Amino acid sequence: MQDAENVAAPEAAEERAEPARQQPVSESPPTDEAAGSGGSEVGRTEDAEEDAEARPEPEVRAKPAAQSEEETAASPAASPTPQSAQEPSAPGKAEAGGEQARHPSARAEEEGGSDGSAAEAEPRALENGEADEPSFSDPEDFVDDVSEEELLGDVLKDRPQEADGIDSVIVVDNVPQVGPDRLEKLKNVIHKIFSKFGKIINDYYPEEDGKTKGYIFLEYASPAHAVDAVKNADGYKLDKQHTFRVNLFTDFDKYMTISDEWDIPEKQPFKDLGNLRYWLEEAECRDQYSVIFESGDRTSIFWNDVKDPVSIEERARWTETYVRWSPKGTYLATFHQRGIALWGGDKFKQIQRFSHQGVQLIDFSPCERYLVTFSPLMDTQDDPQAIIIWDILTGHKKRGFHCESSAHWPIFKWSHDGKFFARMTLDTLSIYETPSMGLLDKKSLKISGIKDFSWSPGGNIIAFWVPEDKDIPARVTLMQLPTRQEIRVRNLFNVVDCKLHWQKNGDYLCVKVDRTPKGTQGVVTNFEIFRMREKQVPVDVVEMKETIIAFAWEPNGSKFAVLHGEAPRISVSFYHVKSNGKIELIKMFDKQQANTIFWSPQGQFVVLAGLRSMNGALAFVDTSDCTVMNIAEHYMASDVEWDPTGRYVVTSVSWWSHKVDNAYWLWTFQGRLLQKNNKDRFCQLLWRPRPPTLLSQDQIKQIKKDLKKYSKIFEQKDRLSQSKASKELVERRRTMMEDFRQYRKMAQELYMKQKNERLELRGGVDTDELDSNVDDWEEETIEFFVTEEVIPLGSQE
């Protein structure tokens, strides 16, 4: 079984790094000059020995008297003894010098140890003050193959480097060619653009025939500013005719050293990952789900089956926290201290890994091409590492980002097709495009006071809202991308808060608006319904004066459900958005014990659940005629998960939220309980998603029309399955009975073999035969006399 914890580095690298973890870091070998001066080293060690003998406390080591300050600084600070500092691990001349420089008493101790006279070595060690000193020297056969970059990479990158002064210079091409009359204006424009990245201390505009040449040189106060300018200003569009190309001046040397001869790249072997969507070809069309139990120590993958779940794969310590499926179900992501691993295929082999120390959160792009990881541990001003976007196919890092402390996950939100992703900061909405990972049109949107935004699941439309500012009303804006055209703006007044809820197909947008009308107390909620598929995007409003607990759209329909009121008077209302724009109340159920709404992925059916504090009350509702099919309870249920087909639903009690009664129960969409699966310290269950169907809407309609024809085939398969299950049950019981008979026969034979031993132990009395003869029985009757006393109630006094 493949080790799931091997994420950030191959096993070979771990084995190479193992000696470094077991031994202290070896010091760098001394110079040839120091190695050759063996006599002076001995003299210094003799002085050190005299100083050590003169000290009253032998535990305190004396610094060599003849050692200079430079040599002191060069010796490792972490070395506990001068011996370990003078015994280099490198071979050759340095090793010979180190051997000469060793303390004479140390050689005497080795000779005494080789002769076996430990009693003589001990007094010498006490005289030298080395009785309790541990040895941190490397063994003679130790080979340190761990480089300094691996151990001290974060420290070495900040070491001083020699600079020739041109690291701070950049070259800007495609600059407008102007004469002396417009040169000053051009300089002001250039300075305004490039001074955002740092202080410009010098500039140079080459001229020819009275005009600039079309390229300029800018020098910054720091090389970091120059790098920042290249990163952000390259590709900047000044106007329709001029788009800047920015490079470092030092890049000239890099490009001039490129060989004129073309080296044919090595052909990379194709890595066959197998069929990553094999589960979709399962004959019974069953779904898979993952289960984490034993407080996270074990993770299993199961086939969902009506009778019992069928285990596919089970591994210990597969993940360190939790798991997550990709949006189309292709990959299973596991979390580790050193990064993320992706698994897939019929054997769940490791597909890819991404090294991100301390990763806590991830997010996939809807197209499964990119992975976003977040870690609070790694982030620097020069090298942003808090958020990293990875290419899943290649495993390469695409870009890193900083993370604000007040941000909410997911920080980046993806468009429905994965072509764009966006993030919100103070008064700014930044939209990036793939695969370049650069800003759309090289600039962010300045939106003063922006509070929240959300992508449409059905198109490249982004919705955002801005609160009121003095006399300016709050507004909700719909923007088409990449053109940035505002297709609808809705002004709102007396707004406290807004929430954006998209219908799964992007047909509707509901903006839940909490507001405080003038002259009234309390909060009133409006549901602003945007009909996205109609011209000019008309808006309808539903007002509710009760407290709103939950809101949810039907995934593939035009209905939505609202939980409102306060316990114990909680109600659920179902609304239907008609084609003419009228919003109709279909049904309202009173006195519901629910705080969450869970729609089936296929629509029509919904589960109203009272999770955690409401003790797991469940109501299964069919919204086609608004009937309650069943009311049940899973005590202290913490989660509800629909399967991708909408046929089954799982309720569970997670060990993460409740420490007892941890289990998951499987129900039909009608509310009929099929299974109760108890798992020790059960933590999490996640269904494996399915990719979108390849069938067209016309084909789906035709299948629904011919459902009766297919249902006969399904019923026949069900009967065969039941018959097969019955045969399997009978066969299993027959096998169990046969196993019992064999065990009973073996026990009887063993019992008879031990008869002689029993006779000997019981003085020749055959106790086996005492109960076999009825004539030897003695019958004894024992009578118990019971006195009954009746006391009338009236005569108790």
Swiss-Prot record:
WD repeats lie at residues 315-353, 355-400, 404-442, 543-584, 632-677. PROSITE patterns: RRM. It comes from Rattus norvegicus (Rat). InterPro entries: EIF3B (IPR011400), eIF3B_RRM (IPR034363), Nucleotide-bd_a/b_plait_sf (IPR012677), RBD_domain_sf (IPR035979), RRM_dom (IPR000504), TIF_beta_prop-like (IPR013979), WD40/YVTN_repeat-like_dom_sf (IPR015943). Pfam families: eIF2A (PF08662), RRM_1 (PF00076). The modification N6-acetyllysine is found at K192, K271, K347. Component of the eukaryotic translation initiation factor 3 (eIF-3) complex, which is composed of 13 subunits: EIF3A, EIF3B, EIF3C, EIF3D, EIF3E, EIF3F, EIF3G, EIF3H, EIF3I, EIF3J, EIF3K, EIF3L and EIF3M. The eIF-3 complex appears to include 3 stable modules: module A is composed of EIF3A, EIF3B, EIF3G and EIF3I; module B is composed of EIF3F, EIF3H, and EIF3M; and module C is composed of EIF3C, EIF3D, EIF3E, EIF3K and EIF3L. EIF3C of module C binds EIF3B of module A and EIF3H of module B, thereby linking the three modules. EIF3J is a labile subunit that binds to the eIF-3 complex via EIF3B. The modification Phosphoserine is found at S37, S40, S68, S75, S79, S84, S105, S114, S117, S135, S137, S147, S222. The gene is Eif3b. Residues 53-62, 100-110 have a biased composition (Basic and acidic residues). The modification N-acetylmethionine is found at M1. Residues 107-396 are annotated as: Sufficient for interaction with EIF3E. CDD domains: RRM_eIF3B (cd12278). This is Eukaryotic translation initiation factor 3 subunit B. Residues 63-91 have a biased composition (Low complexity). Residues 1-141 are annotated as: Disordered. RNA-binding component of the eukaryotic translation initiation factor 3 (eIF-3) complex, which is required for several steps in the initiation of protein synthesis. The eIF-3 complex associates with the 40S ribosome and facilitates the recruitment of eIF-1, eIF-1A, eIF-2:GTP:methionyl-tRNAi and eIF-5 to form the 43S pre-initiation complex (43S PIC). The eIF-3 complex stimulates mRNA recruitment to the 43S PIC and scanning of the mRNA for AUG recognition. GO terms for cellular component: cytoplasmic stress granule; eukaryotic 43S preinitiation complex; eukaryotic 48S preinitiation complex; eukaryotic translation initiation factor 3 complex; eukaryotic translation initiation factor 3 complex, eIF3m; synapse. Residues 153-257 are annotated as: Sufficient for interaction with EIF3J. Residues 129-141 have a biased composition (Acidic residues). Gene3D superfamilies: 3.30.70.330, YVTN repeat-like/Quinoprotein amine dehydrogenase (2.130.10.10).
